[in-house]
Amino acid sequence: MKVIINGKEFDIPKGVRFGELSHEIEKAGIEFGCTDGQCGVCVARVIKGMECLNEPSEEEEETLWRVGAVDEDQRLTCQLVIEKEDCDEIVIESED
């Protein structure tokens, strides 16, 4: 699946948690910390394709709330998983 992160294109397969690819995704300017949804370092905005991604877990929602990321388009990049293949593309931008 085509995923564009801060303008850089990645091919990320369905079912793979983005945190497992942190070393690659960091090249697009997304910073990672713990990669397990606890630290909140990798908050980003899903600009396009949210419907293709997994729902946030309760743990992710708690972390987002704790770090002040309360908008519906904000997610922890490390917790994202593509669940649907019939999407055109997913676009993600890091927080400024």
Swiss-Prot record:
Give the Gene Ontology MF terms in alphabetical order: 2 iron, 2 sulfur cluster binding; metal ion binding
Checking SUPFAM superfamilies in the record gives:
2Fe-2S ferredoxin-like (SSF54292)
> Which Cys pairs does UniProt list as disulfide-bonded?
C52-C87
Q: Which cofactor does it need?
A: [2Fe-2S] cluster
Cofactor detail note:
Binds 1 [2Fe-2S] cluster.
What PROSITE patterns does the annotation carry? 2FE2S_FER_1
Task: Specify one Pfam family.
Answer: Fer2
Q: Which residues form the 2Fe-2S ferredoxin-type domain?
A: 1-95
Gene3D superfamilies from the xrefs?
Answer: 3.10.20.30
Name the InterPro entries for this protein: 2Fe-2S_ferredoxin-like_sf, 2Fe-2S_ferredoxin-type, 2Fe2S_fd_BS, Beta-grasp_dom_sf
Describe the task this protein carries out: Ferredoxins are iron-sulfur proteins that transfer electrons in a wide variety of metabolic reactions.
Q: Which family does it belong to?
A: Belongs to the 2Fe2S plant-type ferredoxin family.
According to UniProt, the name of this protein is Ferredoxin-1
* Organism of this sequence: Aquifex aeolicus (strain VF5)
The organism's taxonomy opens as: Bacteria, Pseudomonadati, Aquificota, Aquificia, Aquificales
